[in-house]
């Protein structure tokens, strides 16, 4: 069982890493305007590995809202995290970020039962942005638990005009 202190340490290092990213040279993607951060539905960005899901989400969040909470579940330090520890994670997020309205959950499909956690956060009026791979997020579980509560955005590798642009 992970403690708030352990999670706070992990989340703090993830936040520092994220804030160090320089997104000024990144290419704008056609999908950026589709991500509706003010929606009551979770914004779920799905795509193949290394297609830029995390980058596009970070870019949109920085440009449109500025301050947001962030968790990267594709982190070996969080691999043992269980569903019943998500409340502890949430407590650590509040301690680190204060009272946030936007939450970026990167690769959350690595946690079993994450959908019910996201549903609860949506009911609490937190705007959720999720990234994940096609194989896991396109499962029937996503469609069952988040039906009517998510906007799926498919992110493909660069188009020719984006690549040349």
Language model segments and positions:
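Phosphate-binding site recognition
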Residues: 1-165
């Amino acid at each position: 069982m992970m403690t708030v202190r352990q999670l706070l340490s992990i989340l703090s290092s993830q936040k520092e890493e994220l804030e160090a990213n320089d997104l000024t040279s990144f290419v704008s993607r056609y999908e950026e305007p589709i991500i509706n951060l003010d929606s009551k539905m979770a914004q779920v960005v799905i795509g193949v590995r290394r297609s830029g899901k995390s980058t596009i989400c970070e870019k949109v969040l920085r440009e449109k809202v500025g301050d947001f909470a962030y968790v990267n579940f594709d982190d070996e330090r969080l691999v043992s995290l269980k569903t019943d520890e998500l409340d502890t994670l949430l407590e650590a997020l509040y301690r680190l970020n204060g009272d946030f309205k936007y939450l970026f959950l990167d690769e959350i499909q690595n946690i079993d039962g994450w959908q019910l956690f996201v549903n609860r956060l949506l009911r609490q009026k937190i705007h959720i942005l999720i990234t994940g791979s096609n194989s896991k997020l396109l499962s029937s579980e996503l469609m069952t638990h988040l039906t009517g509560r998510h906007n799926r955005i498919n992110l493909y590798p660069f188009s020719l005009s984006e690549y040349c642009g």
